[in-house]
């Protein structure tokens, strides 16, 4: 019976998707910096004509400060725009579409309005996108390594996250986190990172939600009934399963956290040899 209900839901989604295309709905990337003035508990109105956006956390709650020592805050003169994950004392993993000319990286941060004693700030020494040191493709290979200009010191609130030892199993319980919006379609940016527990979803669900999308090197994650998702502003942050980074927040459909419309994540394990080779100096 459960299988029948899932298949019926997928059929409904396919029909809804086809109708949205007939009605002129558009799938594309939606990307912008998040201005510092929008931080806090105020709600910011935005005009969104796109159905795909960079991702944020919805349906979750504030992360415990001690539970995200690997989470990196990426910002520039325009404000916060992405998150990243500390892999070791000099390398951060994020999404390729988070590439900017003037990136700064803050480690050991929780509340964006509070300065912490062990907080550290770095800038990139180099940025590397998969298969190219110059051209960062945004969606087909949405992964980027940033080498820091100087090593960071581990502390109570700064510590690397492990790379995956194996790919995640379908149905795995995972956690995604970030400083992205906690409401949609209106956006509300929190002062602190939020965490939400979601699952790695089976390929038929992903195929039904995004029938024209290549499923190579990506994961779909969320909950079938909706209500929990990454959303606008969470891009580049980690999807963590069993204490390892298995995904990088990439994109999804807007509004976020809808029925049978999961978030899309770069599958880190598919790039594990490239990541290890770069870090090893190859």
Curated annotation (Swiss-Prot):
<feature type="domain" description="Peptidase S1">
    <location>
        <begin position="57"/>
        <end position="280"/>
    </location>
</feature>
<dbReference type="GO" id="GO:0030141">
    <property type="term" value="C:secretory granule"/>
</dbReference>
<feature type="active site" description="Charge relay system">
    <location>
        <position position="235"/>
    </location>
</feature>
<comment type="subunit">
    <text>Monomer.</text>
</comment>
<feature type="glycosylation site" description="N-linked (GlcNAc...) asparagine">
    <location>
        <position position="153"/>
    </location>
</feature>
<feature type="glycosylation site" description="N-linked (GlcNAc...) asparagine">
    <location>
        <position position="41"/>
    </location>
</feature>
<keyword id="KW-0645">Protease</keyword>
<dbReference type="GO" id="GO:0004252">
    <property type="term" value="F:serine-type endopeptidase activity"/>
</dbReference>
<feature type="disulfide bond">
    <location>
        <begin position="82"/>
        <end position="98"/>
    </location>
</feature>
<feature type="glycosylation site" description="N-linked (GlcNAc...) asparagine">
    <location>
        <position position="149"/>
    </location>
</feature>
<feature type="disulfide bond">
    <location>
        <begin position="206"/>
        <end position="220"/>
    </location>
</feature>
<dbReference type="InterPro" id="IPR001254">
    <property type="entry name" value="Trypsin_dom"/>
</dbReference>
<dbReference type="InterPro" id="IPR009003">
    <property type="entry name" value="Peptidase_S1_PA"/>
</dbReference>
<keyword id="KW-0378">Hydrolase</keyword>
<feature type="active site" description="Charge relay system">
    <location>
        <position position="142"/>
    </location>
</feature>
<feature type="propeptide">
    <location>
        <begin position="19"/>
        <end position="56"/>
    </location>
</feature>
<keyword id="KW-1015">Disulfide bond</keyword>
<feature type="glycosylation site" description="N-linked (GlcNAc...) asparagine">
    <location>
        <position position="45"/>
    </location>
</feature>
<keyword id="KW-0325">Glycoprotein</keyword>
<dbReference type="Pfam" id="PF00089">
    <property type="entry name" value="Trypsin"/>
</dbReference>
<dbReference type="InterPro" id="IPR018114">
    <property type="entry name" value="TRYPSIN_HIS"/>
</dbReference>
<feature type="disulfide bond">
    <location>
        <begin position="63"/>
        <end position="195"/>
    </location>
</feature>
<feature type="disulfide bond">
    <location>
        <begin position="231"/>
        <end position="256"/>
    </location>
</feature>
<keyword id="KW-0964">Secreted</keyword>
<keyword id="KW-0800">Toxin</keyword>
<dbReference type="GO" id="GO:0006508">
    <property type="term" value="P:proteolysis"/>
</dbReference>
<dbReference type="GO" id="GO:0005576">
    <property type="term" value="C:extracellular region"/>
</dbReference>
<dbReference type="InterPro" id="IPR033116">
    <property type="entry name" value="TRYPSIN_SER"/>
</dbReference>
<dbReference type="InterPro" id="IPR001314">
    <property type="entry name" value="Peptidase_S1A"/>
</dbReference>
<comment type="function">
    <text>Snake venom serine protease that may act in the hemostasis system of the prey.</text>
</comment>
<keyword id="KW-0720">Serine protease</keyword>
<feature type="signal peptide">
    <location>
        <begin position="1"/>
        <end position="18"/>
    </location>
</feature>
<dbReference type="InterPro" id="IPR043504">
    <property type="entry name" value="Peptidase_S1_PA_chymotrypsin"/>
</dbReference>
<dbReference type="GO" id="GO:0090729">
    <property type="term" value="F:toxin activity"/>
</dbReference>
<feature type="glycosylation site" description="N-linked (GlcNAc...) asparagine">
    <location>
        <position position="135"/>
    </location>
</feature>
<feature type="disulfide bond">
    <location>
        <begin position="174"/>
        <end position="241"/>
    </location>
</feature>
<feature type="active site" description="Charge relay system">
    <location>
        <position position="97"/>
    </location>
</feature>
<comment type="similarity">
    <text>Belongs to the peptidase S1 family. Snake venom subfamily.</text>
</comment>
<keyword id="KW-1199">Hemostasis impairing toxin</keyword>
<protein>
    <recommendedName>
        <fullName>Snake venom serine protease NaSP</fullName>
        <ecNumber>3.4.21.-</ecNumber>
    </recommendedName>
</protein>
<keyword id="KW-0732">Signal</keyword>
